């Protein structure tokens, strides 16, 4: 009887907090959360999508709405009651994946790189700085002072509760170092290597009628890095396939790092050199899958299969495809992500790393592609830079996917795969968007000395 009374009491409490006025962004059940996220992404009726196409491209394009749906160029979802709903970003994505609409032939990722893009790459390639072994070119570098902010507007569903907040922190790598927390709005706990997602955790009680503000200020030094193709080919060695390290980074991690051995071997043919295999896969992806605005990652069952099926993908989706293909070929690869900090282009970004025996970890930005239409557009090193190099405009906080946050989160994460915006929850549920806002603010950048590493 006591159990029945307790259950009734808990039900009453839940009803008081989670009544009819509960905002859609307050998530208590994982399955319902994913369903609501799908509804949020697929929010346009066919007629609304047609109207949006007319606004963007004119009546002649809008008249072909059903044709674009049939071709898979407008992503749709059929609801349980039989209604066809269109992905909210699909109309704006159309010009990115359909040259007939844009009027511009798409060539490959990176083909449209401009002089400022090339200048960033050349500054790394031409840097006189190198490691002790003279093949890891590290430089230029910069020290970045930044502020990360999370603001949670007041809502009655939060009343009397405590907000738990996780924010990204730069992770120490061969390219990121001298990381420090300068100040914070609340006492904090750092994950300190206990998760693939590097975080700072804070909590604070909700004050009735008032927004809750969290922030911290930090600084770190980040360097660019480049390994020439000649150095890789001259130093590469066979993998020790019995080593635990090798197993760790060639193992599949379903549902988003999966066996694509058939597809990968079709790309590489008879090539046996791991670097040249990597280069063939990189070019294949860069040449075939244009960038397009993404759905919430948490609603996609298998990221690399999504790219193969849809014919396009954002930075994280093509990176996952690349990592899956590398591991399927027995080449160690891993995820890295956070933010890109290029002048005038502060945004979330995902990339990868590949491991070559005799060299070590080499950064790979699949989304940036090969600069210029052909290697001769600029030069070979500039053309293929991002297949074995990276710039200094990075804030990397993740070296893996789908990890457990520290301290552990109780409810479903807003970002179930990656970790860039942060996470917020209470004792009663997860806060999804737009229940809170976060931002990364760059306070100051200064040229920095480059740390030297004898090996990785």
Regions found by a protein language model. Give the residues of each.
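Short loop/turn segments at secondary-structure transitions that flank enzyme active sites
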Residues: 171-173, 220-226, 291, 358-360, ...
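Short intrinsically disordered coil segments
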Residues: 180-184, 230-239, 366-369
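C-terminal segment of classical bacterial N-terminal signal peptides
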Residues: 12-18
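Intrinsically disordered, low-complexity N-terminal segments that are enriched in acidic
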Residues: 31-226
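Sec-dependent N-terminal signal peptides
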Residues: 4-12
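Acidic low-complexity segments
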Residues: 18, 23, 31, 192-199, ...
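Active-site neighborhood of thiol-dependent amide/isopeptide-bond enzymes
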Residues: 269-351, 355-357, 372-375, 379-387
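Active-site rim recognition segments
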Residues: 340, 344-456
């Amino acid at each position: 009887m006591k159990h029945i009374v307790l259950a009734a009491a808990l039900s009453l409490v839940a009803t008081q907090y989670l009544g009819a006025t509960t905002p859609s962004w307050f998530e208590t059940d994982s399955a319902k959360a994913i369903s609501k996220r799908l509804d949020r992404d697929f929010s346009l009726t066919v007629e609304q999508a047609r109207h949006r196409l007319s606004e963007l491209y004119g009546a002649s394009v809008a008249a072909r709405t059903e044709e674009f749906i049939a071709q898979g160029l407008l992503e749709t979802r059929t609801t349980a009651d039989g209604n066809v709903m269109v992905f909210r970003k699909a109309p704006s994505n159309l010009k990115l994946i359909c040259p007939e609409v844009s009027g511009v032939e798409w060539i490959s990722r990176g083909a449209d790189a401009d002089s400022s893009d090339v200048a960033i790459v050349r500054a790394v390639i031409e840097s006189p700085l190198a490691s002790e072994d003279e093949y890891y070119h590290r430089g230029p570098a910069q020290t970045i002072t930044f502020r990360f902010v999370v603001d949670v507007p007041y809502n009655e569903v939060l009343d009397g509760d405590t907000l738990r907040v996780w924010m990204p922190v730069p992770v120490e790598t061969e390219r990121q170092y001298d990381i420090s927390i300068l100040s914070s709005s609340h006492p904090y706990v750092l994950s300190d290597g206990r998760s693939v997602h590097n975080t700072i955790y804070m909590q604070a009680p909700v004050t009735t009628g008032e927004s809750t503000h969290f922030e911290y200020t930090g600084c770190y030094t980040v360097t660019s890095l480049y390994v020439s193709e000649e150095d890789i080919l001259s130093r590469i060695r066979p993998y020790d396939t019995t080593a635990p390290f090798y197993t760790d980074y060639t193992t599949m991690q379903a549902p988003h790092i999966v066996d694509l051995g058939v597809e990968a071997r079709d790309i590489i043919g008879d090539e046996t050199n791991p670097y040249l295999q990597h280069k063939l896969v990189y070019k294949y992806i860069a040449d075939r899958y244009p960038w397009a605005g993404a759905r919430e990652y948490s609603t996609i069952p298998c990221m690399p299969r999504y790219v193969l099926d849809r014919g396009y993908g954002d930075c994280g989706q093509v990176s996952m495809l690349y990592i899956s293909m590398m591991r399927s070929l027995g080449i160690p690869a891993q995820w890295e992500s956070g933010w890109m900090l290029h002048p005038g282009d502060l945004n979330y970004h995902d990339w990868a790393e590949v491991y070559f025996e005799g060299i070590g970890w080499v950064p790979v930005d699949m989304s940036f592609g090969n600069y210029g239409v052909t290697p001769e557009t600029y030069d070979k090193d500039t053309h293929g830079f991002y297949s074995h190099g990276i710039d200094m405009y990075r804030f990397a906080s993740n070296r893996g996917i789908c990890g457990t946050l520290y301290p552990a989160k109780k409810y479903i994460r807003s970002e179930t795969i990656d970790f860039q915006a942060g996470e917020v929850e209470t004792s009663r549920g997860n806060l999804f968007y737009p229940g809170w806002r976060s931002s990364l603010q760059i306070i100051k950048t200064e040229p920095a000395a480059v740390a030297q590493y004898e090996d990785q």
